[in-house]
Amino acid sequence: MKGLIARFIAGFALLLWAWDMVFPWQQLMQAEENRYNQIQQRKILRVGMVNHPLSYFIGAEGTAGIEYELAKSFANYLDVRLDIKTFDNSEQLFSALKDNKVDIAAAGLLYQPELSKQFQIGSAYYSASWQVVYKKGSNRPYKLSELEGDLIIPAGSAVLPILQRLKEDNPKLSWQTTNQFTQEELLLQVAEGKIPYTVGISVDISAAQHIRPNIAVGFDLTDEAPVLWYLPNSSYSELQAAVLDFMNHANETGLISRIEEKYFNHLAHFDYVDIQSYLKAIKLVLPKYQSLFEKYRGDLEWQMLAAIAYQESHWDPNATSPTGVRGMMMLTRDTAERMKITDRTSAEQSIRAGSEYLHMLMRQIPETVPKEDRIWYGLAAYNMGLGHLLDVRRLTRQLGGNPDNWLDVKKNLPLLAEKRHYSGLKYGYARGFEAFQYVENIRRYYSSIINHQRVEEQQIQNNEEQSSVPQEISKESDSTLKE
């Protein structure tokens, strides 16, 4: 990532020098007032976004998303207020950018040559590709010529110019558009067999697979491309330079790494059987215990407490292990006595004690650990003991890392099982690799509960407002959309 940012800065510096030779800045200033100065004068940064489960959304804990967190940090960097303006699709967003209604377009947008001719490129912070998806179990297409039906895509999608370009070499390629469904909803329609194919961005597909595991990737429609911000083409490049400076700062301070860890890391592991079992349990078992998770959640979201319990026992209050731990939260006898519970197989007693014990551990974590990361430290301590957590913090410091940065700490957890490392630590050997996987699993389970609930709520709303998909798809592909 650092190399990518450095190359972008060098490239843009050369570009700006060449542009200055051809078209003096004074002419630009006469044509339009400096966009960067406009932002500073109004003390507001206007960023256009599209509601999206990874980029921008309003959840139980407030506004969140990759683009939101980056934009919020950039506004703070400029010492201005952030004003989010939302649009239904990329087409509307770019229209607003062209009409000076927003200063930046940030919506998980991939680099496209066509767009780079119309707008300035702001910054790149991860990469992704467009992929064709189908339902697992049906015939897999390996290339465009093997599609046995139309692609269904949202109206105004950023993939439209790509499809139009691909059609030049694939004249039989056809697609239909719909105004009624988002890209995420179309992925779910594929999973349910209601439509044959759609196209999505690779990270979005990975996220969708954790709530509908029968979504499968047929093939890559494009190579990986940078995901970046777009800026008005007519603006003086001081805004562009500010964006690049900020992204370089965000990379050096670890902000980008922390955001990627938060939104992407749990997507790396995909186990079809495990996810199928988990989703079945969410529907059939979780409702029995949801009220208890809500009652004893403390400072946690109840979904997080539920995810911990699933990792511990798969929501089985009678679960046992050869090591002697028992119950929904798999408590040891000593912990049960310490938390004053009399029956470890009581779901309520176990959930209460597990939550109280986790909160107790989190209170003992140094205050220098950021609030948003304390839960991960607490979970590691819950799994392997507070002493070993303190050991891995010391080890992280010895190895030149930051003990208050979860990314630095978690990569050192497996080292607690290596003699050359644990022999010099106060609490000695620990199965740190298990603690590492324990935390990763809980993050994945937590995310799946959140997304499953959101999708279920959206589908209920759609069922109330809309009829079936085939009647709502607009067959415009061979006329206005593909000239």
Swiss-Prot record:
Active site (UniProt): 312
CDD domains: MLTF-like (cd13403), PBP2_YfhD_N (cd01009)
Basic and acidic residues composition bias: residue spans: 473-483
Pfam family, one: SLT
A Gene Ontology BP annotation from the UniProt entry: cell wall macromolecule catabolic process
Region (LT domain): 269-483
One GO term describing the cellular component: cell outer membrane
Region entry Disordered, spans: 459-483
Assigned protein family: In the N-terminal section; belongs to the bacterial solute-binding protein 3 family. In the C-terminal section; belongs to the transglycosylase Slt family.
Domain notes: The N-terminal domain does not have lytic activity and probably modulates enzymatic activity. The C-terminal domain is the catalytic active domain.
Function recorded in the entry: Murein-degrading enzyme that degrades murein glycan strands and insoluble, high-molecular weight murein sacculi, with the concomitant formation of a 1,6-anhydromuramoyl product. Lytic transglycosylases (LTs) play an integral role in the metabolism of the peptidoglycan (PG) sacculus. Their lytic action creates space within the PG sacculus to allow for its expansion as well as for the insertion of various structures such as secretion systems and flagella.
Protein name in UniProt: Membrane-bound lytic murein transglycosylase F
Species for this entry: Actinobacillus pleuropneumoniae serotype 7 (strain AP76)
